[in-house]
């Protein structure tokens, strides 16, 4: 089934200048970039986007990291886009990520792990709406 999902290329990947390589992974695996923008998240936006993690011990570090530099936010579209994106990203901890996944190849740590991807179709809809107006899609 054709789906849309949200992907964020995080500050660590932008600092390493691997944005193009990451986008190529998506495109060469059947995911089309249908919307994209580069921005610098405010603390408030980062806190709102990651509100589900507010009570978790890593929340403060996550927010500090996500506002430490610019990010690239994209809507990816393709067959089973949510699952395909998650497979391409690899495990949250790059040390556990399968060889050839984005996190295994470009991430440094569980915190600086290069990319974010929606974990369900419902969350994909909500996350896309957080960053993109319907007219932009």
Swiss-Prot record:
Xref: Gene3D superfamilies: Nucleoside diphosphate kinase-like domain
Broadest EC class assigned to this enzyme: transferase
Annotated binding of ATP, by residue: 10, 58, 86, 92, 103, 113
EC assignment: 2.7.4.6
Pfam families: NDK
Cofactor(s) the protein requires to work: Mg(2+)
MF terms (GO), sorted A to Z: ATP binding; metal ion binding; nucleoside diphosphate kinase activity
Residue numbers annotated as active site: 116
Entry-linked InterPro entries: NDK-like_dom, NDK-like_dom_sf, Nucleoside_diP_kinase, Nucleoside_diP_kinase_AS
SUPFAM superfamilies (UniProt xref): Nucleoside diphosphate kinase, NDK
Subcellular compartments: Cytoplasm
Ribosomal protein recorded as keyword: no
CDD domains associated with the record: NDPk_I (cd04413)
Keywords assigned by UniProt, alphabetized: ATP-binding, Cytoplasm, Kinase, Magnesium, Metal-binding, Nucleotide metabolism, Nucleotide-binding, Phosphoprotein, Transferase
Reactions catalysed according to its record: a 2'-deoxyribonucleoside 5'-diphosphate + ATP = a 2'-deoxyribonucleoside 5'-triphosphate + ADP; a ribonucleoside 5'-diphosphate + ATP = a ribonucleoside 5'-triphosphate + ADP
GO terms, biological process: CTP biosynthetic process; GTP biosynthetic process; UTP biosynthetic process
GO cellular component: cytoplasm
PANTHER family according to UniProt: NUCLEOSIDE DIPHOSPHATE KINASE (PTHR46161), NUCLEOSIDE DIPHOSPHATE KINASE DDB_G0292928-RELATED (PTHR46161:SF3)
Quaternary state and interactors: Homotetramer.
Family: Belongs to the NDK family.
NCBIfam families: PRK00668.1
Function: Major role in the synthesis of nucleoside triphosphates other than ATP. The ATP gamma phosphate is transferred to the NDP beta phosphate via a ping-pong mechanism, using a phosphorylated active-site intermediate.
Protein name: Nucleoside diphosphate kinase
Organism from which the protein derives: Helicobacter pylori (strain P12)
Gene that this polypeptide is encoded by: ndk
